[in-house]
Swiss-Prot record:
The record marks D125, E171 as: Important for ligand binding. Residues 1-7 are lumenal. Homotrimer. Residues 98-105 are annotated as: Important for ligand-binding. GO terms for biological process: lipid transport; regulation of neuron apoptotic process. It is found in: Nucleus inner membrane; Nucleus outer membrane; Nucleus envelope; Cytoplasmic vesicle. Sigma receptors are classified into two subtypes (Sigma-1 and Sigma-2) based on their different pharmacological profile. The gene is SIGMAR1. Residues 30-222 are cytoplasmic. This is Sigma non-opioid intracellular receptor 1. It is a single-pass membrane protein. The chain crosses the membrane at residues 8-29. Residues 176-222 are annotated as: C-terminal hydrophobic region. It comes from Gallus gallus.
Length: 222
């Protein structure tokens, strides 16, 4: 009892501190100002749905830079990077990233599917081309989405996902973005061991963070 007592106390204090940290983070996410709005990204993508995806993406990037100057990565920092996660394989091009938001282009040139992941973030996908099938946890039927549709993945939700070859979309995420990286990088670390892709992914996210830091300090006149 004498040995277990201090150990139990430390565990209890640790859990209490962690709970307070989570509560504080939740409050911060709820009250902070966000650069983007889900409806804005969805409407912009919907406007170009049905076009050739490369043409649509180029138009979307131009419009985002006009609406959010200083918050979209420059052309020289845009790179399509493979993503292996949850058993599926796709490719993403990061446009914007911070601790609480991201905007990226995502898709696949082959049929692929797997587990969506469960995040501390809300994710909005608006389809430009192809089809997206989603099977939600606790249900016995799947739904298919088409160009122009927006799929909302709520925080804490898990689904089965499947994309047909040639499916491309615009994705907006809002929440504690670093919490999504564990899932996004797990297959790379423990399955494919494609450490070059790991480097590309972390480099893109770092560039996004640095761009946001620069934008923040510019508002302070630094």
């Amino acid at each position: 009892m004498g040995v277990a007592g201090p150990w139990v106390l430390r565990v209890g204090l640790g859990l209490g501190a962690f709970a307070l940290l989570l509560q504080g983070l939740r409050g911060w996410l709820a009250c902070k100002r966000y650069e983007f709005q889900p409806a804005e990204i969805a409407e912009l993508a919907r406007h170009h749905a049905g076009l050739d995806h490369e043409l649509a993406f180029s138009k979307i990037i131009v419009e985002l830079r006009k609406k959010h100057p200083g918050h979209i990565l420059p052309d020289e920092d845009l790179q399509w990077v493979f993503v292996n996660a949850g058993g599926w394989m796709g490719s993403m091009c990061l446009l914007h990233a911070s601790l609480t938001e991201y905007v990226l282009l995502f898709g696949t040139a082959i049929d692929t599917g797997g587990h969506s992941g469960r995040y501390w973030a809300e994710i909005y996908d608006t389809i430009i081309s192809g089809t997206f099938r989603q099977w939600k946890e606790g249900t016995t039927r799947s739904e298919i989405y088409y160009p122009g549709d927006t799929i909302v993945h709520q925080a804490g939700e898990a689904t089965s996902v499947q994309w047909s070859a040639g499916t491309w979309m615009v994705e907006y995420g809002r929440g504690f973005v670093p919490s999504t990286l564990a899932f996004a990088l797990a297959d790379t670390l423990f399955s494919t061991q494609d450490f070059i892709t790991l480097f590309y992914t972390l480099r893109a996210y770092t560039k996004g963070l640095l761009l946001e830091a620069s934008a923040f300090f510019s508002t302070l006149g630094c």
